[in-house]
C-alpha cells in the first residue's frame, strides 16, 4: 500500500503544477487528478485509466502525467479530444 500512497501523492503533485483540468476516468468514475482523496479511493495498479486534459498547458500536462503514471506502473492513455 505504501507504494500506492507514493503514486497517489506524486500524481496529485504533478497535476497541480498545471493549470489545465486533468480528469481521470476509471470505468464509469471521473476523478479530478489534483484530488488526493479521489485518487486514494480509485487508484489500483491492475486497471486501465484514461486521462482527459483540457486547458492552456494541456500538451505539457499530458506529457507530465503519462511520465508519472508510467513511473508507478499504472496503465494510462490520453483520451481523444
PLM region descriptions:
Residues 1-6, 75, 79:
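Short, charge-rich amphipathic segments
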Residues 3-17, 32-45, 59, 63-66:
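Amphipathic alpha-helical interaction surfaces in cytosolic regulatory modules
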Residues 50-81:
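C-terminal structural segments of small proteins and small subunits
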Residues 18-19, 73:
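Conserved NTP-handling cores and scaffolds of large molecular machines
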Residues 20-22, 47-51:
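Conserved beta-strand core positions
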Residues 25-28:
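Short, glycine-/small-residue-enriched flexible loop/hinge segments at domain edges that mediate gating
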Amino acid at each position: 500500500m505504501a507504494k500506492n500512497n507514493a503514486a497517489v501523492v506524486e500524481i496529485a503533485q504533478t497535476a497541480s503544477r498545471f493549470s489545465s483540468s486533468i480528469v481521470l476516468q476509471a470505468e464509469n468514475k471521473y476523478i479530478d487528478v489534483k484530488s488526493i482523496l479521489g485518487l486514494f479511493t480509485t487508484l489500483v495498479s491492475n486497471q486501465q485509466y484514461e486521462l482527459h486534459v483540457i486547458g492552456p498547458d494541456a500538451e505539457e500536462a499530458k506529457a507530465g502525467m503519462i511520465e508519472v503514471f508510467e513511473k508507478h506502473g499504472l496503465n494510462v492513455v490520453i483520451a481523444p479530444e
